[in-house]
């Protein structure tokens, strides 16, 4: 007990001593800080002899930057006095760096103002002379500044000193303001990037405006010439660009409207020319020396004696190059397609009223925006709105449902922003979808100089859209059932038949559904009959891969790089050697339902598609793949990455839309041919109303083609007959029993074989591998049961 008391008493005595010591230090600190402040004030204002001496000393050391030294010393003194702590290291370093930067600035100013070129004499003597000859305010950076400049100018030149000064000044502000270098550099780069993007956008916008002005001038000239020739005024539903042309339905500003109606109104003016072009084509066909029994006007030309000798399924060979040209063959006339009927479209007064409703709706939700342009398309009308400055685009996008409610629309699609323009596009469905036919899409470019140009439909502005397969170079078409996918495929095939001859383009059609493409059996453009067996389809794709490799061998021996160069080489050889060596035709492979092929032979089909899409462009082979199940197990990453051009029809979810085109939007399409198209190298989608083609029109074109020339199938390209899987054997003695057991139970798994035959896991796994290799069972798909591909009654399902 006494010892404990002694310890506590000694602790109390120690605490008392430290407290007394702190109390004694406090007045000394205040006295020291007061003295420092007084000396700084005397020196800064040069008060008395002491003040002039202090200022002279600091001027000799720091020059014109001494005033910053006064301020820094004063701030540090006050901070230490009241906070009883030394300033943070980061800000202390920032103050020192700022002092150093000002030393460089002051000395550089003195250096340039006195035209100092070299300093051969010693620094101290030079500084002393300058100090004696110079008044206080103009004495450079003092002794320290002279030494620094004397050191750095020979090392990094005067330009390097200026750059270092700027960097020191920037670093000092970053340190003093306690900022992060990463944040500063990031914000700097972001500002530079945004400014460069803004500059590039403004340049693009100016170019587009100039282009639009040129187009408008050209259109005005054409309109004047047309008025003089026809002596008629423009129709009310032409493109309206003048405010006076609008019906006065309100006091608001009128909006220019561009639309699908323009295309319909221009059609009668050029109908005579088009009819004349078709008649000239028919007269030319009649003038050809042939033994036709019927006229071409009846669309049923008879074949020549040479064509009659060809069998419907004669076996040919493509071992050398291609097929010899048939001089008697003529492409089908466009008159085989039905003339589109004029339909009642949305009135412009109604469209303008909806534009005003749209403006008022946005204004009610606090969004200041103005409708600047309206485009009436076949299926939707696009309202182009320009938001005021400071309005976020996301705010307009979030009003999606409110806009649909105000316009009484089924659904609206917002394109924010429109690519290349400072505006937002709001696409509203029309009350009635205008039918777009393939004839009106093709008639402006028929016959096309490009062999693989096919018609797709009309865009929002009503302009016809056609694509060239050799530029795509491969196409993915996907959408739900009934969305217009099969009609699009028929339009592509019919466009090829209308534009090319059999020796120019060859087709390979794969139709596992067995009902969509069978109508094309027998046309001379086919390499082989339409493939409907999924097992044969994978073999047919392998044949295409072999043909691709063979063509590359031809390119190698002829020192050419692609099919165009090779055909030019063949034409040159024919002229020089007076030969008739045929040219290589383009090959278009069309798969109507990829999901069925992936289900039966997924790995083989995927590998073949990968090789074709990666290498076949130069060989003149192009692939079109269609599917109604746009899931990731059908459209795999490998297939998607190698097919750059895609068409998305209406789908059920945004996930499916992202699987097809890599972005949402297809889930808001209207169906019936409404599609989103993404071309090769494009990052934005184009909304198109697909061209409609009836079954009767397809049949008429097919009949015309078949009557002129029969199919000449290539035996080398035909897939082998499917192997009878019941005769396949395995090294395992239990294979036959396992085969019968699996097709009887219609299910298969490793554990099931283990229990049934009382074998180990390894042997059962080998049996499963043999069954999969022989295409008795499908591949494994996670936790899902394997699909059985055969049964007892019918060997192939």
From Swiss-Prot:
It comes from the Bacteria. Its main location: membrane. ATP binds at residues 482-487. The keyword Nucleotidyltransferase does not apply. Residues 172-797 are cytoplasmic. It holds the Pfam family FtsK_gamma. Residues 462-658 form the FtsK domain. GO terms for biological process: cell division; chromosome segregation. SUPFAM superfamilies: MFS general substrate transporter (SSF103473), P-loop containing nucleoside triphosphate hydrolases (SSF52540), Winged helix' DNA-binding domain (SSF46785). GO terms for cellular component: plasma membrane. It is found in: Cell membrane. Residues 201-225 have a biased composition (Basic and acidic residues). It is a multi-pass membrane protein. Residues 1-21 have a biased composition (Basic residues). The chain crosses the membrane at residues 31-51, 60-80, 92-112, 151-171. Residues 282-313, 338-349 have a biased composition (Polar residues). This is DNA translocase FtsK. It comes from Staphylococcus epidermidis (strain ATCC 35984 / DSM 28319 / BCRC 17069 / CCUG 31568 / BM 3577 / RP62A).
